[in-house]
From Swiss-Prot:
InterPro entries: DAP_epimerase_AS, DAP_epimerase_DapF. The keyword rRNA-binding does not apply. One of its GO terms (molecular function) is diaminopimelate epimerase activity. This is Diaminopimelate epimerase. The gene is dapF. PROSITE patterns: DAP_EPIMERASE. GO terms for biological process: lysine biosynthetic process via diaminopimelate.
């Protein structure tokens, strides 16, 4: 079967986008997702994004995300920015702001005149059971309004903030993110037994109260050039710990994101993420190949 696709990226976090809205697509198997995402034998991407008709009231579209390992996941902020650019460029909507159904609710995406996209990422969740994160037997320590948790990583203790942005994140502050062994520790944290659904591992360097550098080892994808939910989780943890003030500029290997959160006043406030979205190319691929 010939499959039309669009290759996009948001700050270097790259995606294969499929239009299941204009016409229904057959369900993709995990093996087919892995084949499409393969950088040597397929198109190549961190994630595959599927645009569909919504199944709940109040939504304009449904947005599904599949990691390059074939598994479906809850949320992807960089992908959300590409999503709204895709539906706008394809003429699927004439709205500048759309409501989109994701696995755990609705999000609002707004395409600005300068081409950047603002995403209402929702409120962060810090309750360990809702991340989910097993803290049984652990002694946390308070820092600001946050609780840091000790995590055994390869025999060393790492103090993390556990945050859900609709998907699970473990955030730690490091002195030098470029020198830090992200590729060694990332997979150990991602698959740590205390995270039953695995976890995205974030490594944040504080530059100033309004600026950080961030690397994220993503669940099911490895280290990516940028991670939108990871940026939001890191900023929320930093503000809650008293280390950062909103808005925060987040520098990733793929580009820069701006995160705003009024969490110092109201932890139920939504995080707002602004950043780029770009189309790289379009094409067709034979799924049977």
């Amino acid at each position: 079967m010939k499959l039309s696709f669009t290759k996009m990226h948001g700050a270097g976090n790259d995606f294969v986008v499929l239009d299941g809205y204009s016409r229904a697509l057959p369900p993709l198997t995990e093996a087919q997702v892995r084949a499409l995402a393969n950088r040597h034998f397929g198109i190549g991407a961190d994630q595959l994004l599927l645009v569909e008709k919504p199944t709940v009231d109040g939504a304009d579209f449904k947005y599904r995300i599949f990691n390059c390992d074939g598994g479906e996941v809850e949320h992807c902020g960089n992908g959300a920015r590409c999503f709204v650019k895709f539906v706008s460029d394809r003429g699927l909507t004439d709205k500048r702001s759309v409501r989109v159904q994701v696995m755990k609710g609705l999000i609002t995406l707004t395409l600005q005149d300068n081409g950047e996209v603002v995403v209402d990422m929702g409120a962060p969740v810090f309750a360990p059971a809702q991340v989910p994160f097993d803290v049984s037997g652990l002694d946390g320590r308070a820092e600001g309004r946050d609780t840091l948790w000790p995590l055994d990583v390869g025999g060393a203790t790492r103090w993390i903030s556990a945050v859900s942005m609709g998907n699970p994140h473990a955030v730690q502050v490091v002195d030098d993110v470029e020198a830090y062994p992200v590729l060694e520790e990332g997979p150990l944290i991602e698959r740590h037994a205390r995270f039953p659904q695995r976890v995205n591992a974030g490594f944040m360097q504080i530059v100033s109260r309004h600026e950080v550098k961030l690397r994220v080892y993503e669940r099911g994808a490895g280290e990516t050039l940028a991670c939108g939910t990871g940026a939001c989780a890191a900023v929320a943890a930093g503000i809650r710990r008293g280390l950062l003030d909103s808005p925060v500029t987040v520098h990733t290997h793929g580009g820069t994101l701006t995160i705003g959160w009024d969490g110092a006043r109201d932890e139920a406030a939504a995080l707002m993420m602004a950043g780029p979205a770009a189309t790289v190319f379009e094409g067709e691929i034979d799924l049977t190949a």
